[in-house]
Structure formats: structure tokens, C-alpha cells
Amino acid sequence: MNASSNVSNVEIANKIASAAALFRKYFPDASVNFSPWDNTNESMQDTIDFAFHFPGWSPLIECRAILLQLRIENDGNGRVPKLLGIIMRGMIVPSERWRVATIGDWEMTGTHLPQKEQKDNLILVCKELYKLFSTTSAGNKN
């Protein structure tokens, strides 16, 4: 679900804004889109989705945009949802170039992987997102 559609109170709005700022701390050239989907349907309510667009294709990160999906468990009580996992996809229209998921071994896969420094920064973003949501998330070993 679009990040903008998940805002139901100030605490959730703060977490969403902080998540975007955290990403931009490591990738300051990226612009954030809080509504990456044209429409949001009921089947996507278990995610908070962002898109981060770069001013052009970046050979360092091997993409033009990154789709960031925060997998959540929302109990419907208006509190900040529990963060279950993170999926990032490096995209060049119309295809995915790489992906990393925080389920399993956190291994980055794909046909065109980012440079080491950018890979390390993407993993740091994931770790810091877990810290950001730690008030409602179960502990994560990474």
C-alpha cells in the first residue's frame, strides 16, 4: 500500500517520514515518492511502499529507482504496525535489476548489483529501519 495511504495518526506519519529521511541520509540525490502505485487495493495492506528516484541512471547503484517495501503486521488498532521484513528492488523501467530481502540471509541478488559501498549502505538502511520501528518490532538478529 502506498506509504501516503497508511497515515492514520501522527505516530505513523512520523515513522513514514523518518523512514524516507533515513533512506535519503545514505542516498541524498534520491527523491521520495510516497505513492508509487497508481491505485491501492485491499491485497496490498500488508506493506508500506515508497519509491526513491535518482536524477538519472546510476552506475554505482545500477538502477534509476528503488522500490522499498516494508512488510508489516497491522493489528488495525491505529498503532504503529509491527515491521516483519523489508524488500528493496533496484529498478530500470521495465525490469528489476537487483533485490535484497531481510528474510533469510539478507543476500542481494540480481543481474546488475550495486557497487560495494552502495550495497553496504542499502543494508544499513534496512538495519536502521528495524531500529526505527523497534518500538513495535520483534528483535531482529541482523
Map each language-model feature to its residues.
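Charge-rich, low-complexity N-terminal segments
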Residues: 1-51
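Intrinsically disordered, low-complexity regions enriched in small/polar residues
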Residues: 25, 29, 36, 52-56, ...
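Amphipathic, interaction-prone secondary-structure segments
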Residues: 30-85
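Intrinsically disordered, low-complexity regulatory regions enriched in serine/threonine/proline
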Residues: 67-142
